[in-house]
């Protein structure tokens, strides 16, 4: 793509554009391509023919809105209608109907789909591009073995190999290989055609002996030999049509279909001119590949870099949806074929509508969105998370790599990633380097390659052109790096700049540069582009920061950062959490849940999101930002969403921090905070939890929702209304009943009272009882009920039960154990909340909000936090906000430090506070101990940093158990917080207790508190009475389990117990 115009006018593309454009490409092109492949279907007697007329297919508008689909747990989809005809060949009559094929899930403008009420997203996959690749490996003798690997469109591989005697083999399986002549002959070429189409016929003539010549004497012999080697069949197989079909299905269709992209790559690599619509591997391809392999063997050619992005292709959402649509049509074809045969067999008159069912298409897409590894639940923790999730690229998935087998070379950064895949933003752990994030300006090209924009430097034309180049093209240009550009063009032309050429980094004169970067953020992802002073941070810490920003919780009172990078507004806008005016007009009414706009004679009602739950239990809420009577323009922000302020991303708070040790409470990345952060609700967030229950029709009758629950205390039922559902606005505690439900059941005969048995015997009355199956609030769920939804499916049946959902809001203040982090990888856990009077305070009396450990900076090499901290202090005093692009050293040396010191100096002058900038130790200040009032010995770095509260909160993780459930086999406490489990005392824990000599505590942990059934029952009673706990006199259950397992191995283990009494008696007798 080439754009003319001024370089200052280039804009950042929409962050959700890649997903939405891919879906539009599927609707416009992929849908039609697959429908055209649908064949004409005939019955066995060839009397009836069924076909689709795909030129006039229709996609109906969805019957429900997005909000209703989420509310009722439905799929937001469109119905596909295609005209179909049924032709009777004997009478030449045709019956035509428009039939319903199925539902296709739609995608909104943010790149997400709603399936069964859940937001889902399909991420892009990076695969090896189909074609041929030459590489060299060393065998066990240390000799180079050259191979050419042919990769099909489906991922199947075949290899051409040349040995030390210059003989060429085709490896059709891991163990079997055949001569290249046999393969070419089996594909339809004779020896004369082979020799006429190769550059080295003497090499091809040198190795066939009499036996080989017999094998390639005819096509049938070559096919038999090829089948024998491929299928590993012994004996002498006989040539037949079924043998050819089996070979065609198992080998040629899986390993020889190159596809559109593979044909293009094959033509370019081997200098062929085969038409693009010929997507299968031809004998001509095999011979040209063998010629190139011989040339590479003798030094005339280059090997391929398998990790270069020019040898990769992006499998986007369009390709995945098209593959699933083709699979659904194959299933539909089989169903139609079977229905036609059944109708003819039973002498029925079929119609097009009766032949087609919507089940194949609907179930295929539901299983794809629900089970496919590349279809994931959209992470909606905060607005940044939503847009970053859709820009992920993964090497994993079907046809790709696995986290355990991928090598370090694949995970590593490659020079071709420049401007296409972010070198910083990747996942941590086993998938590091395999799941990346697309760079800001990257886009997916027509051939599935990642393209990046550059400015072309031309002296002939004064206009600046912007080119989008694929990885195979930009390696032929000298590309200047974006961080080497100067504002003064006169100086720029004289300087020597770093550039990239053929995957190498060089230093060249400016006159030799062909292209240059268009933007300093061009090679970073969105997450990395939001880190100020990123050039002063270690890459590992920048990676942690870009990951932790996606874990930030939206706060109740958001605040935009003092020091930013300028992309905060674009990120908030593209996330879709803010309400944007689509038309200009006048605000005639505004409320907490809606805005009414009047313009062009129409009145438009804009509903706002009210306390909506995300799938990470965070609160999504919109706040109106316009007043009644104001005139607005198109594109203006009407309401801020969660974690946005004034249309800018606001994930954290600007707090006053100090880098100093404080009584050891901030060692090992712990953080000391002031109680002001609690009392002033600075880090207070709202979380919404969903609890649901369903009513079924059992064999004993339907379940009932009621507030009359026997055998339960009235205190637990105090919040239920007359229908048995908790009332809105109620405050509920752990154990309270949210929905009262009774399940009918028939009691056993032995459990009846005597009078009940008499009634049954005399009157034949069946006495039924009900079991209480209420929805109870679990541990840690206390809060306020903000919404109750009773969803009744149409035509309710056993398969469509009624669902009741209760939404409870929790207000969480920051507390000890919560995790906080900055934007430079500086993370920590709250260790202590100090009273404000005990916190260190500045020279003007302001107490510090947070105290960080200074030892966390030099070893981690994330010095960017110090620049941000000092510049934030200046911005807070001057009431300024800074937006700084990275790599500002391209303007002058030490530009970041000079900017920070100049702003601190100006703040010191304007506020008449000389302590803000002291020349002896710039950036530091003398501060005082809040407990004693004495100054600390050393000056301390103080400033305002942007600190976020992360989703890892202590309320979700802390757990304690007094009693609970036990495992059936081992009789030991269950494992995990969700099951109210206990903490396991394992082998190493036992060693630790033994090391301290605490024998009685160890015995309690292994007996009373674990699996000694009788002893743990006696402990409770003796504890209440106040007596001594008796020693156990029998074995624990785990020992008995060991004995049983040994018996299952035919080993009898006899054991007996020796008590302390026996020892004491024997001791007295002695």
Curated annotation (Swiss-Prot):
Cellular compartment(s): Plastid, Chloroplast
Subunit note: In plastids the minimal PEP RNA polymerase catalytic core is composed of four subunits: alpha, beta, beta', and beta''. When a (nuclear-encoded) sigma factor is associated with the core the holoenzyme is formed, which can initiate transcription.
Swiss-Prot/TrEMBL keywords: Chloroplast, DNA-directed RNA polymerase, Nucleotidyltransferase, Plastid, Transcription, Transferase
CDD domains: RNA_pol_B_RPB2
Family annotation (PROSITE patterns): RNA_POL_BETA (PS01166)
Matches recorded under InterPro entries: DNA-dir_RNA_pol_bsu_ext_1_sf, DNA-dir_RNA_pol_su2, DNA-dir_RNAP_su2_dom, DNA-dir_RNAP_su2_hyb_sf, RNA_pol_bsu_bac, RNA_pol_bsu_CS, RNA_pol_Rpb2_2, RNA_pol_Rpb2_2_sf
A Gene Ontology biological process term: DNA-templated transcription
Enzyme class: transferase
Organism of this sequence: Buxus microphylla
UniProt protein name: DNA-directed RNA polymerase subunit beta
Coiled-coil regions listed in the entry: none
Family: Belongs to the RNA polymerase beta chain family.
The keyword Kinase belongs to this UniProt entry's keyword annotation: no
């Amino acid at each position: 793509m080439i754009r003319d115009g001024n370089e200052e006018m280039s804009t950042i593309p929409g962050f959700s554009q890649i997903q939405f454009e891919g879906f539009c490409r599927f609707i416009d092109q992929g849908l039609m391509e697959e429908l055209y492949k649908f064949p004409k279907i005939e019955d066995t007697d060839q009397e009836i023919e069924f076909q689709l007329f795909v030129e006039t297919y229709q996609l109906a508008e969805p019957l429900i809105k997005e909000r209703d689909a989420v509310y009722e747990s439905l799929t937001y989809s469109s119905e596909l209608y295609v005209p179909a005809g049924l032709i009777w060949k004997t009478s030449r009559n045709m019956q035509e109907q428009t039939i319903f094929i199925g539902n296709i899930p739609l995608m909104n403008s943010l790149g997400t789909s709603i399936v069964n009420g859940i937001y889902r997203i399909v991420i892009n996959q990076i695969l090896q591009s189909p074609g041929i690749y030459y590489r060299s490996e060393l065998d066990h003798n240390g000799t180079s073995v050259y191979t050419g690997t042919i990769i099909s469109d489906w991922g199947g591989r075949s290899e051409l190999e040349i040995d030390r005697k210059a003989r060429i083999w085709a490896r059709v399986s891991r163990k079997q290989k055949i001569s290249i002549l046999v393969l070419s002959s089996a594909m339809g070429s004779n020896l004369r055609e082979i020799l006429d189409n190769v550059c080295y016929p003497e090499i091809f003539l040198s190795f066939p002996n009499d036996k080989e010549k017999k094998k390639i004497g005819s096509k049938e012999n070559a096919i038999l030999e090829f089948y024998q080697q491929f299928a590993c069949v012994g004996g002498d197989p006989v040539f037949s049509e079924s043998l050819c079909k089996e070979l065609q299905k198992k080998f040629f269709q899986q390993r020889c279909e190159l596809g559109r992209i593979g044909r293009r790559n094959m033509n370019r690599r081997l200098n062929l001119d085969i038409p693009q619509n010929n997507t299968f591997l031809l004998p001509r391809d095999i011979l040209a590949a063998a010629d190139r392999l011989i040339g590479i063997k003798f030094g005339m050619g280059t090997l391929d870099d398998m990790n270069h992005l020019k040898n990769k292709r992006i499998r986007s959402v369009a390709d995945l949806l098209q593959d699933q649509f083709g699979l659904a049509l194959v299933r539909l074809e089989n169903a139609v074929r079977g229905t036609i045969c059944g109708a003819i067999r039973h002498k029925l008159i079929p119609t097009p509508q009766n032949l087609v069912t919507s089940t194949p298409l609907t179930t295929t897409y539901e299983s794809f969105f629900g089970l496919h590894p590349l279809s994931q639940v959209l992470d909606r923790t905060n607005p940044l998370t939503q847009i970053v999730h859709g820009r992920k690229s993964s090497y994993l998935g079907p046809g790709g790599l696995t986290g355990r087998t991928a090598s370090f070379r694949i995970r590593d950064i490659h020079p071709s990633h420049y401007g296409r895949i972010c070198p910083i933003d990747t996942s941590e752990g086993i998938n590091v380097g395999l799941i990346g994030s697309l760079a800001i300006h990257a886009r997916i090209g027509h051939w599935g390659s990642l393209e990046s924009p550059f400015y072309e430097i031309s002296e002939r034309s004064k206009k600046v052109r912007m080119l989008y180049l694929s990885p195979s093209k930009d390696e032929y240009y000298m590309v200047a790096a974006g961080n080497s550009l100067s504002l003064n063009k006169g100086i720029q032309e004289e300087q020597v700049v770093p550039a990239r050429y053929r995957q190498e980094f060089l230093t060249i004169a400016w006159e030799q540069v062909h292209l240059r970067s268009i933007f300093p953020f061009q090679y970073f992802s969105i997450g990395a582009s939001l880190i100020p002073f990123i050039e002063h941070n270690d890459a590992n810490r920048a990676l942690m920061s870009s990951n932790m920003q996606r874990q930030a919780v939206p706060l109740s009172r958001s605040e935009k950062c003092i020091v930013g990078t300028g992309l905060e507004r674009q990120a908030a806008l593209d996330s879709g959490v803010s309400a944007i005016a689509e038309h200009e007009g006048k605000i005639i009414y505004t409320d907490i849940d809606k805005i009414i706009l009047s313009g062009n004679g129409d009145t438009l009602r804009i509903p706002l999101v009210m306390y909506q739950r995300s799938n990470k239990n965070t609160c999504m809420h919109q706040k109106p930002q316009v007043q009644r009577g104001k005139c607005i323009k198109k594109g203006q922000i009407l309401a801020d969403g969660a974690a946005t302020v004034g249309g800018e991303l606001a994930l954290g708070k600007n707090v006053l921090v100090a880098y100093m040790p404080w009584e050891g409470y901030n060692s090992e990345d712990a953080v000391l905070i002031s109680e002001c952060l609690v009392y002033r609700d600075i880090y207070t967030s709202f979380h919404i939890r969903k609890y649901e229950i369903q009513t079924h029709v059992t064999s004993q009758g339907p379940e009932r929702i009621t507030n009359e629950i026997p055998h339960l205390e009235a205190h637990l039922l105090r919040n239920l209304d007359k229908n048995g559902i908790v009332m809105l606005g109620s405050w509920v505690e752990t154990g309270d009943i949210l929905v009262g439900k009774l399940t009918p059941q028939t009691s056993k005969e032995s459990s009846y009272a005597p009078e009940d048995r008499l009634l049954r015997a005399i009157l034949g009355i069946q006495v039924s009882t009900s079991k209480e199956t209420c929805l109870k609030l679990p541990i840690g769920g206390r809060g306020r009920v903000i919404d109750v939804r009773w969803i009744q499916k149409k035509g309710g049946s056993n398969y469509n039960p009624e669902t009741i959902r209760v939404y409870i809001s929790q207000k969480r203040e920051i507390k000890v154990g919560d995790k906080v982090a900055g934007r430079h990888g500086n993370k920590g856990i709250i260790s202590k909340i100090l009273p404000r009077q005990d916190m260190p305070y500045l020279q003007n009396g302001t107490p510090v909000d947070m105290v960080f450990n200074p030892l966390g900076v030099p070893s981690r090499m994330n010095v960017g936090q110090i620049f941000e901290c000092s510049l934030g202090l200046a911005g807070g005093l001057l009431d300024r906000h800074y937006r700084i692009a990275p790599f500002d050293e391209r303007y002058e040396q030490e530009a970041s430090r000079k900017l920070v010191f100049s702003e601190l100096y100006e703040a010191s002058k304007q506020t008449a506070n000389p302590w803000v900038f002291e020349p002896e130790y710039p950036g530091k200040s003398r501060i005082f101990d809040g407990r004693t009032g004495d100054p600390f010995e050393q000056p301390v770095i103080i400033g305002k940093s942007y600190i976020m509260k992360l989703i890892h909160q202590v309320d979700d993780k802390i757990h304690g158990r007094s009693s609970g459930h036990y495992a059936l086999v081992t009789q030991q406490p269950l494992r995990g917080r969700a099951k109210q489990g206990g903490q396991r005392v394992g082998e190493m824990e036992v060693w630790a207790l033994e090391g301290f000599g605490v024998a009685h505590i160890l015995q309690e942990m292994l007996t009373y508190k674990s699996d000694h059934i009788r002893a743990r029952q006696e402990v409770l009673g003796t504890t209440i009475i106040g007596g001594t706990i008796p020693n156990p006199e029998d074995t624990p259950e785990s020992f008995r389990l060991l004995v049983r397992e040994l018996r299952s191995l035919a080993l009898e283990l006899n054991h007996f117990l020796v008590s302390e009494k026996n020892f004491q008696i024997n001791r007295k007798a002695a």
